[in-house]
């Protein structure tokens, strides 16, 4: 979706920002970016296009922002699949910048803010070793939320080959007997439900656009459901357009179209991303990114964070103190859940290197889905033993 007004550069999603050389008053913004570890560079006209500038910084376009006052710079960035394109309207060219592919248009760089306060994944304490974490969770009843791919399951080359990590099902069964649990996935609801295979828990598919409660009650976001026919059309167009690209998989889901490029040639990824972002603009959808995937979904203000809060509100709870939400996830879309959990719960990121040592809103970390299974098993055991310790 194209929009106007203030925009935020997020070090969780962006590794660098490229400015065209005609822009002035960039010094303060550059200083803010450098303080949070986001690189900066410039590009000019002619052959010095944004993709060349990104190469100089050794950053992927999919994790890079372009800021340009000219249609040529915006167009070049869109054709190369950059993550965020900010147009700067200095001469009344707002509409042209939007047509050429700007994600947002500002009139002054003071409208661009920089997110602060996050830490790099490598800087976080291990959730299994953090002193007092487990005891604090046992003292108050937790509600535990899991992502699937990269959290309960290892990331694999073929998404259809992803299943629970060894020991995860048994650990989930033990934990579900002690506290509410939910699996929130970007996969279709039926898909993630089958892959986990544990009855009597919450499942959310398509980043929360569709859910089932432990009793089987089905819920869906009706505003998002209106986009289902459009997503079907976009999926067909992308399959035709990207079919000749070896290693690219277009996955049509009920509430989304995921384009996986993990097995594609690196020099074709920009074209893949550009095709998806063009479809976003053509069909008035929204783009999200993840680990070697770019996805179209309904342009509705809903995400895993809002889903988590909705589920919390629907959980039965007899105690006087509120439930403590724990969220475990690995991907960019999980950051929305970390944001809402952080003030009063426990956000845990599962480390990986697909996006380098990126920033995260999580407060703790685990190193792999195997460690997630271990953490889950340990928490279940401590919850089981808590009444014994109290007597």
Curated annotation (Swiss-Prot):
EC number in record: 3.1.3.12
Reported pH dependence: Optimum pH is 7.5.
GO biological process: dephosphorylation; trehalose biosynthetic process
Ligand binding (Mg(2+)): 147, 149, 330
Disulfide bond entries: none
Entry keyword set: Hydrolase, Magnesium, Manganese, Metal-binding
Thermal dependence of catalysis: Thermostable at 50 degrees Celsius for at least 5 minutes.
Regulation: Inhibited by EDTA and calcium. Diumycin and moenomycin stimulate activity at concentrations of up to 100 ug/ml, and then inhibit at higher concentrations.
Active site: 147
A cellular component term, taken from the record's GO annotations: cytosol
Uppermost EC category: hydrolase
Pathway as given in its UniProt record: Glycan biosynthesis; trehalose biosynthesis
Any one Gene Ontology molecular-function term assigned to this protein's record: trehalose-phosphatase activity
Keyword Manganese: yes
Binding residues for substrate: 147-149
A Pfam family this chain is assigned to: Trehalose_PPase
Catalytic activity from the UniProt record: alpha,alpha-trehalose 6-phosphate + H2O = alpha,alpha-trehalose + phosphate
InterPro entries per record: HAD-like_sf, HAD-SF_hydro_IIB, HAD_sf, OTSB-like, Trehalose_PPase
Requisite cofactors: Mn(2+); Mg(2+)
Additional remarks: Was identified as a high-confidence drug target.
Family: Belongs to the trehalose phosphatase family.
Function field: Removes the phosphate from trehalose 6-phosphate to produce free trehalose.
UniProt-recorded name of the protein: Trehalose-phosphate phosphatase
């Amino acid at each position: 979706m194209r929009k106007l007004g203030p925009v935020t550069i997020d070090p969780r999603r962006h590794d660098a920002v490229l400015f065209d050389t005609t822009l002035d008053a960039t010094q303060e913004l550059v200083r803010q970016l450098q303080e949070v570890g986001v690189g900066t560079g410039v590009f000019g006209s002619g052959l010095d296009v944004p993709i060349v500038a990104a190469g100089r910084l050794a950053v992927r376009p999919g994790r890079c922002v372009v800021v340009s006052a000219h249609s040529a710079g915006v167009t070049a960035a869109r054709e190369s699949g950059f993550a965020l394109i900010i147009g700067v309207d200095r001469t009344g060219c707002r509409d042209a910048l939007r047509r050429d592919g700007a994600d947002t248009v500002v009139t002054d760089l003071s409208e661009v803010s920089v997110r602060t306060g996050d830490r790099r994944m490598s800087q976080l304490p291990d959730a299994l070793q953090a002193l007092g974490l487990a005891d604090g969770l046992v003292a108050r009843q937790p509600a535990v939320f899991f992502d699937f791919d990269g959290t309960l399951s290892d990331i694999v080359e073929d998404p259809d080959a992803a299943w629970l990590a060894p020991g995860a099902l048994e650990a989930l069964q033990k934990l579900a007997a002690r506290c509410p649990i939910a699996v929130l996935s970007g996969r279709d609801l039926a898909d993630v439900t089958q892959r986990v295979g544990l009855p009597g828990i919450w499942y959310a598919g398509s980043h929360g656009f569709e859910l089932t409660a432990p009793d089987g009650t089905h819920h869906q976001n009706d505003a998002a459901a209106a986009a289902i026919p459009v997503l079907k059309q976009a999926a067909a167009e992308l399959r035709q357009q990207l079919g000749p690209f070896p290693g690219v998989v277009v996955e049509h889901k009920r509430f989304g179209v995921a384009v996986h490029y993990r097995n594609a040639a690196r020099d074709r990824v920009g074209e893949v991303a550009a095709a998806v972002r063009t479809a976003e603009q053509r069909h008035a959808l929204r783009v999200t990114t993840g680990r070697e995937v770019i996805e179209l979904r309904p342009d509705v203000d809903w995400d895993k964070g809002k889903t988590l809060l909705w589920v919390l509100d629907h959980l039965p709870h007899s105690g006087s103190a509120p439930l403590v939400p724990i969220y475990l996830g690995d991907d960019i879309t999980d950051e929305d859940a970390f944001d809402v959990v952080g003030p009063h719960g426990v956000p845990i990121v599962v480390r990986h290197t697909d996006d380098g040592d990126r920033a995260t809103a999580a407060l703790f970390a685990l190193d792999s889905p195997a460690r997630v299974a271990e953490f889950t098993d340990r928490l279940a055991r401590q919850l089981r033993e808590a009444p014994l310790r109290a007597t």
